[in-house]
Regions:
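Active-site metal-binding loops of divalent metal-dependent hydrolases
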Residues: 14, 35-37, 60-62, 100, ...
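Metallo-beta-lactamase
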Residues: 1-17, 23-25, 128-154
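Binuclear metal-ion centers of metallo-dependent hydrolases, dominated by the metallo-beta-lactamase
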Residues: 50, 64-145, 216-251
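His/Asp/Glu-rich metal-coordinating catalytic cores
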Residues: 1-94, 101
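Conserved beta-strand elements of the Class I
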Residues: 7, 21, 32, 94-96, ...
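C-terminal regulatory/interaction regions
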Residues: 112, 140-251
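Short helix/loop capping segments that flank catalytic or ligand/cofactor-binding pockets
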Residues: 17, 41-43, 65-67, 104, ...
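Generic "edge-of-domain/loop-turn" microfeature
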Residues: 13, 27-29, 102, 124, ...
């Protein structure tokens, strides 16, 4: 495009998400803009494909060392146990997660565990759109007001206030990276929190920098100043887009 070569790369965030790699035709300088991304394995998102760049502009949603997520196997077990425990006492397990991305990942996890589910209309429509675009995830069943026995229900978080009073005998779980903090159940008003995230955690953010090998890094979104400070400690040139970086002194 004009004086630049543009390339889209899989971000690993959700199905179809992409990063942008830019090379100047004039001097060969390169830039990688990640947008939201993750490096962890996924059933529905394409595998992240980082490549080297001179400048890295990266999201740092979870850019502090206390944000390190469990592996996918452990997350799957938490989801399975929550659903089966709810079934065992005659309750409906309800998972609250975004309609696009996380809901499709959850459907894949539930399907692998042999747990059938019904989905809110918005979740169902997003899933069908992903399937039309090539995502290999089951279509699921659209919620019609009733949840069959031994079925889980998938709802967007912003529909919970309206929908939950209609579902007697239910248990709720929020699926969010912020669920790593035990206080998340109070923030989201759920029975449990499960830290299924479609963002890179602290270790993945550092690994992304290692793979890209940039000369300079700009952090955007989340703990931008904190992660930029961590990178400067590791001898990178790194700055928060928000500014007001606190410079470190070697004493």
């Amino acid at each position: 495009m004009g004086p630049f070569l543009l390339k889209l790369l899989p971000a690993g965030h959700i199905f179809g998400s992409a990063m942008l790699h830019v090379i100047s035709k004039t001097n060969g300088a390169s830039l990688l803009y990640t947008g939201d991304f993750k490096l962890r394995e996924s059933y529905t998102a394409e595998t992240n494909a980082l490549i080297p760049a001179d400048t890295l502009i990266m999201e740092t949603t979870f850019g502090k060392p206390n944000w390190i997520f469990p592996g996918l196997t452990e997350i799957e077990e938490q989801i399975k146990c929550f659903a089966l425990e709810a079934f065992s006492v005659g309750h409906v397990p309800i998972f609250l997660c975004y309609s696009l991305g996380k809901s499709q990942e959850l459907q894949a996890i539930l399907g692998k565990a042999g747990i059938p589910s019904v989905s809110h209309r918005l979740v169902y429509e997003m899933t069908m759109a992903c399937r039309r675009a090539g995502c290999k995830v089951a279509s699921g069943v659209k919620f019609d007001g009733l949840v069959p026995d031994n079925h889980a229900l998938i709802l967007p978080p912003n529909s919970a206030k309206k929908m939950l009073p209609l579902i007697p005998n239910c248990k709720t779980a929020i699926l969010s990276g912020w669920g790593l903090d035990a206080r998340a159940i109070h923030r989201f008003g759920t029975n449990v929190s499960i830290p299924l995230s479609d963002h890179a955690d602290f270790n993945e953010l550092k690994e992304a920098v290692n793979q890209v090998r940039p000369k300079r890094i700009i952090t955007v979104h989340g703990f931008t100043r904190e992660f930029a400070s961590e990178l400067r400690r590791l001898k990178y040139e790194a700055w928060s887009l928000q500014g007001h970086d606190q410079l470190e002194l070697d004493l």
